[in-house]
Amino acid sequence: MKKLTIGLIGNPNSGKTTLFNQLTGARQRVGNWAGVTVERKEGQFSTTDHQVTLVDLPGTYSLTTISSQTSLDEQIACHYILSGDADLLINVVDASNLERNLYLTLQLLELGIPCIVALNMLDIAEKQNIRIEIDALSARLGCPVIPLVSTRGRGIEALKLAIDRYKANENVELVHYAQPLLNEADSLAKVMPSDIPLKQRRWLGLQMLEGDIYSRAYAGEASQHLDATLARLRNEMDDPALHIADARYQCIAAICDVVSNTLTAEPSRFTTAVDKIVLNRFLGLPIFLFVMYLMFLLAINIGGALQPLFNVGSVALFVHGIQWIGYTLHFPDWLTIFLAQGLGGGINTVLPLVPQIGMMYLFLSFLEDSGYMARAAFVMDRLMQALGLPGKSFVPLIVGFGCNVPSVMGARTLDAPRERLMTIMMAPFMSCGARLAIFAVFAAAFFGQNGALAVFSLYMLGIVMAVLTGLMLKYTIMRGEATPFVMELPVYHVPHVKSLIIQTWQRLKGFVLRAGKVIIIVSIFLSAFNSFSLSGKIVDNINDSALASVSRVITPVFKPIGVHEDNWQATVGLFTGAMAKEVVVGTLNTLYTAENIQDEEFNPAEFNLGEELFSAVDETWQSLKDTFSLSVLMNPIEASKGNGEMGTGAMGVMDQKFGSAAAAYSYLIFVLLYVPCISVMGAIARESSRGWMGFSILWGLNIAYSLATLFYQVASYSQHPTYSLVCILAVILFNIVAIGLLRRARSRVDIELLATRKSVSSCCAASTTGDCH
C-alpha cells in the first residue's frame, strides 16, 4: 500500500475533530508542533490503496494573519500547508454555514494543492431547510465535494474512495481580482525563490498585498519590494487588502447563489429556544453553576460507585498479591514490604482515580461537543469584562477543569498581551482533574453525605480566587480595558458516542500514564526513606524514619492551617504535590498505609485472590445499585460509598491525624491554591517568562496560606482565641502590604510576553513531547 500524508483543515466548530476521530479511531498520537506549545494530533487509517497519516491542523477561519499579536493557529496551518509535507488536504466545511466556511476553501484552492472538500453537518443543514447541490458545488470549486454527517459516520467510505482517486484540482479561475492586483502579485512572484511553484508564488504575492505578515518569510527578496508595490497600488485603489477580501466574498456569494438556498435558510428553532434560557442575563449564571455542580456530582457518585472494582481489585493484585509472592518465595521482609508498599501501593493509588477522573473527562467532552461550553463563555462575559478581560478568556479557564497546562496554553487565542498574561496568572486556580482525585478521597473521609457539596465549593472557590486575582492585577500592575468579544455559537447537537469515548480515552490515558509514572516512583522513594533513620539504620516504627524526622522540623510552619506536628505525612504530601497534584494522594496513601500496616500482619495462608476480586465486583455492584436507587436520586447530595470503610486502612489513619473536618477542608484549600505542578510552571514560563512564573508561584503560595489560615482559625477560634486572632490579623496585614507594593510597582512592570515564535520551517516539524493533554 502506498503511504499518503493528509492535512485536515477547517473552521472551528465545523466537526473537524469528530471526523478525525471517525477516521483514525484510537490510532492517534498527541504532541506539540515543534517550537510552540500548540497541540498537534496525528492519526493513522487505511483506505483500499493507501496507508494514510492524517494531521489535524488547528481550526482557523483563514490563512491570513494581519498581526503578530493574534493566535498561532493561522501561522501553523499556513506553514504546514506551504511546507509541502501534505500530499493532499481535506477541507472540512460546515454545510449550515457554507458562505463563511468557503473563504478558507478559496484560499486553499488558490494554492493549487490537491484538495477534497468534506461537506459536513448536512443533518443540521437539512433541519434548517438548507439545500446544497453537491455536484454543482464540486464543478464550481474544481475539486471533489463529499457529503458527510461525521457524527453518524455517513459518507466516511465515500471520503476514503475519493482519497484513493485524488488528483490535482481542475484549473478553474475562482476569484476575479482587479487587474492591478494581479499585475503586482505577479511582479512580486517573479522575485520569489524559483523552487516555489508559480501558483503558490502568486498566492503568496496576494497574501502579502492583503497584509499577511508570515507570507513574507517565504517571499525572499520580494518582501523588500513590498512597500514600493503597495505604494503603487494605492495610487489606483484605496485599500488593496479590502479589494482582495471583497473579490473573494463576491466569488463566494456567486457560488452560494448557484448551489444553495442559504439566503432563505431558517435558524435552528431548538438552538434558538434553548439559548433564550441558557443565555438569559438572570438565568445564565445559575444554570452554568448547576451544570458544573452536576458534573462533580456525577464524578463523585458514579465514579465513586465504580471505585471498589479498581481499589479493592488493585489491592488484591498488586499489594496482597505481591506480599503473598514475597512470603511464598521467602523474600526478605524489607523487600516484600518495599515492593508491596512502594510499587504495589503506587499502582493502587493510581487505579482508584480512574473512574472519577474518567467521569469528569467524559462530562467535559459532552459539554464541549454539545455546544454548551461556548455559551458558558458568553454567560461569563459580563464578569470577565469587569476584570478587563473578554469573555473569550473564560474558555481556556474552563479547559483548566481538565488540566491547567492546556488552560495556560489556551491563552494564546487572546489578542492582547495583557489579556493573555492575566489569563495565564488566573489559570492555576482552576481546579484540575488531579485535584479532584484529592478532593474525592477527603470527601469520602470527612464530609459524608455532603461530599459532593464540599467538592463543588472548592471548585467554586478556585473560580472566585481566579476572579479576585484578575481584579487585583487589573487595579495594580495590569490596568486596561478588554477588547470586544465576538465568538461563534455552534448549533446544539447530541455528541457522537464514538467521538466522546475517544476524546475521554485520550485525556484519561494521558492522565494515568503521567500520574502513574510519577506516583509509582515517588511511592518507591518514600517507602525507602520511610524505612531508614537519618543514621542509615532500618527502623521498625516509621515515626523514627528519616522522612519523619525531617518533616517534623517543617510541619510547624503549617500549624496555622490545621496541620499538627504528628501529621507530618500531610507536610510531605504538599512538597511532593508540587511535582504533580495527583502525587498528594499517592504520598498520603503510602505514608498512612505504612503507619497502619504496623498493626496489621498479612497472613499468606488466608490470602485468596479469587475471593478478593469477587468482593471487589460485588461491592461495586452494590454501590452502583445504591447510587441509582430512588432514595439517592431524590436526595442527590449523597457521597460516594465506594471508597471503603473509614475505621481501617490509610483513610482511618488520615481521619485520626487531621482530627476534624475543618482541618481537612483547610488543607484542601491550600492544595487547591498553592504552587501549580511542574508541568504548569513550565507552561507559564514558556508562555510568559520565568519572572512571571515566579510571581505566579509566590502569589499562589500567599493566597493558599492566607485563605487556609483564615478559614481554619475562624473555624477553631473558640479553642484558642488569642492565637487565632494573631494569625488572622497577621495574614490581613501582610496582604495589605503586598497589594500596596504591587500598586507602587505598576510603572516598572513589563507585561509583554516572551517571543514564542520560532523559525518558519521549525513550526512545521512534529514534536511528540507533550505536557499534559
UniProtKB/Swiss-Prot annotation:
Positions of the FeoB-type G domain: 3-169
Transmembrane segments: 282-302, 309-329, 344-366, 383-403, 427-447, 453-473, 518-538, 664-684, 691-711, 722-742
Assigned keywords, A-Z: Cell inner membrane, Cell membrane, GTP-binding, Ion transport, Iron, Iron transport, Membrane, Nucleotide-binding, Transmembrane, Transmembrane helix, Transport
Superkingdom of source: Bacteria
An MF annotation (GO) of this entry: GTP binding
Compartmental location: Cell inner membrane
Pfam families membership: FeoB_C (PF07664), FeoB_Cyto (PF17910), FeoB_N (PF02421), Gate (PF07670)
Binding site for GTP 1: G10, N11, P12, N13, S14, G15, K16, T17
Residues given in the record as GTP binding sites: N120, M121, L122, D123, V149, S150, T151
Major subcellular site: membrane
Binding residues annotated for GTP 2, in chain numbering: G35, V36, T37, V38, E39
GO cellular component: plasma membrane
List of residues binding GTP 3: D56, L57, P58, G59
PANTHER family in the cross-refs: FE(2+) TRANSPORTER FEOB (PTHR43185:SF1), FERROUS IRON TRANSPORT PROTEIN B (PTHR43185)
Protein family membership: Belongs to the TRAFAC class TrmE-Era-EngA-EngB-Septin-like GTPase superfamily. FeoB GTPase (TC 9.A.8) family.
Function description: Probable transporter of a GTP-driven Fe(2+) uptake system.
Protein name (database record): Fe(2+) transporter FeoB
Species per Swiss-Prot/TrEMBL record: Shigella flexneri
